[in-house]
């Protein structure tokens, strides 16, 4: 009997998923980063009006130009000069990450990923034929990776590094000096930088420091 591809069989359920399966029906879940509020009324109305106007057809490959332009403007504080040509709309953050790994990782090539980490980072790298190497983000360093740990893990097969600030799941953030050190490490080893900043607006002290 034929079986699934090796890359599919290599993907195992995460610890988070196992805990969900063990939970009873009356359990209060703290396991998902899901807001307890609805989208703003202006957004709901805009989606509603778009459906009434028949705007539910195929768009350009990169996404609606007006949406891409708005996103570029929203990032102007972090990366001045962005235009809609620098933005590509995807179905989700995970879909965007898969696209990046498909673009950057040849079979056998490695990406450095943070640990603790969002559960789909590693499986996404595996599914495209790449390999994940995990660098530690320790409590005693406020979950910010240390350059000496990164230096011990990088090798000639490593082509990219993923940074995640604010971090999921630790909540760790970085300051400007730490950002500059992490950028310099990547430049030194000629690594692609993948920056997951999906929680950039959930900051309780200070301001978000972007790697853009």
Roles of regions detected by a PLM:
Residues 1-7:
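Generic N-terminal amphipathic, Lys/Arg-enriched alpha-helix
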Residues 7-92, 99:
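N-terminal small-domain helix-loop-helix segment of the aminotransferase-like
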Residues 8, 32, 114, 171, ...:
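Glycine- and other small-residue-rich loops at beta-strand/loop junctions that grip anionic moieties
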Residues 24-27, 129, 157-158, 190:
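Residue-level detector of structured alpha->beta connecting loops
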Residues 55-184, 201-212:
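Conserved core of the PLP fold type I
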Residues 191-192, 203:
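Metal-dependent active-site segment of extracytoplasmic phospho-/sulfohydrolases and closely related
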């Amino acid at each position: 009997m034929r079986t699934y591809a090796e890359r599919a069989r290599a993907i195992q359920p995460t610890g988070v998923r196992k805990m969900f399966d063990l939970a009873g029906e009356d359990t209060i879940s703290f396991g998902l980063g899901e807001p307890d509020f609805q989208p703003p009324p202006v957004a709901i109305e805009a989606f509603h009006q778009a459906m009434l106007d028949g705007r539910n057809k195929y768009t350009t490959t990169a996404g609606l130009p007006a949406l891409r332009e708005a996103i570029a403007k929203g990032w102007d504080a972090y990366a001045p000069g962005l235009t809609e040509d620098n933005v590509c709309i995807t179905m989700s953050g995970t879909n965007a990450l898969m696209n990046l790994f498909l673009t950057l990782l040849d079979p056998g090539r490695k990406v450095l990923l943070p640990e603790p980490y969002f559960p789909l980072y590693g499986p996404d790298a595996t599914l495209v034929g790449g390999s994940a190497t995990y660098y530690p983000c320790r409590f005693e360093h406020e979950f910010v990776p240390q350059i000496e740990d990164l230096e011990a893990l990088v090798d000639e097969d490593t082509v990219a590094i993923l940074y995640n600030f604010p971090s999921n799941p630790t909540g760790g953030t970085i300051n400007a000096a730490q950002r500059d050190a992490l950028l310099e490490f990547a430049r030194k080893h000629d690594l692609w930088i993948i920056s997951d900043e999906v929680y950039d607006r959930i900051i309780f002290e200070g301001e978000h420091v972007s790697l853009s």
